[in-house]
Regions:
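Active-site anion/phosphate-binding pocket segments in diverse small-molecule metabolic enzymes
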Residues: 99-289
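Active-site-proximal beta-alpha core segment in soluble small-molecule metabolic enzymes
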Residues: 1-120
Length: 289
């Protein structure tokens, strides 16, 4: 379980499932120890150290709380210790500082005569970005399992996993001047042949994380990204057969319109959408090959 919890019902369910829990606070440790004792078992846990994410975990200076788990909580078996890196995709100096702070806690744990178990800090970005850095006992791969990383890495050897697939449900010609999508965002300069595909943002296409950071430098970065997309005419596309075709106008909730003027295709032809599986709606049928 990769998050800490002090909620009794969650802890009971996890223990019944024989799961390994995360302990990231004194409250969680006390709750887990008590419930495990009541259930007449020992809970296996990994202790989370917060070196910068600010979510779950003991801060490096809270070692008394960490040592209390080993000393005063007999129903807890510590089998691991970890931290999570918040900028491994770009800020190497900051990342190495986080790793050093984490390793200091691990070293102090051992100096006090306690065994931290499996030690791990590396996420997908750290695995591919921190070449030459000792990665301890294990790595926690997330986005790399989908063949995607948070930074450009030409030699990762990864292949994208997962795509959305639908079929062409409508083919028609639009006259010059006709518009496509909400707001009429696309206007045809000439007569064009279009295909309508019954798949849109409600299924996970053309969705992205909200820009939720309010630092000035992030705002500048977002503006520059938008300018680049505008100047380079970067567009969304889908794949029909072995050809990429551009999306026209705004993607709708349930539909996407594409330009097939120069493509030989027919109703019912398969259409592939390149998309991260992380954004695909739970309502979409999944097939594993």
């Amino acid at each position: 379980m990769m998050r800490s919890t002090a909620l009794e019902d969650e802890i009971e369910s996890l223990l019944k499932a024989n799961a390994i829990l995360t302990v990231g606070s004194n409250e969680a440790a006390v709750a887990i120890n008590g419930i495990a004792g009541r259930m007449n078992l020992r809970a296996r846990v990994h202790i989370k150290i917060d070196t910068g994410m600010g979510r779950y975990g003991f801060e490096p200076g809270e070692f008394e709380k960490i040592s209390a788990i080993f000393t005063y909580m007999p129903n807890i078996e510590v089998c691991g210790m970890y931290t999570h890196l918040n900028a491994a995709f770009g800020n190497k100096k900051k990342t190495l500082g986080q790793i050093a702070a984490f390793h200091a806690v691990v070293a102090k744990t051992r100096e006090q005569g306690f065994e931290p178990g499996m030690v791990h800090f590396a996420n997908s970005s750290a695995l591919f970005k921190l070449r030459g850095v000792e990665l301890d006992d294990g790595v926690r791969i997330g986005s790399a399992f989908t063949g995607r990383l948070a930074f450009a890495c030409k030699d990762s050897g990864l292949r994208k996993v997962g795509y959305l697939e639908s079929r062409i449900c409508e083919i028609r010609w639009l006259t010059r001047g006709a518009t496509v999508g909400y707001g009429g965002a696309y206007r045809a300069r000439n007569a064009i042949k279009i295909a309508v595909i019954p798949l849109g943002y409600s299924h996970g296409f053309a969705t992205e994380k909200i820009r939720d950071s309010y630092r000035f430098r992030d705002g500048v970065r977002f503006v520059l990204q938008d300018i680049k997309r505008t100047l380079t005419h970067e567009r969304l596309w889908v794949e029909i057969g072995d050809k990429r075709v551009p999306v026209l106008g705004h993607v709708g909730m349930l539909h996407t319109v594409v330009d097939i003027t120069n493509l030989d295709c027919a109703l019912g032809d398969a259409v592939r959408f390149d998309i991260s599986p992380l954004y695909v709606s739970a309502a979409v049928l999944r097939k594993y090959i």
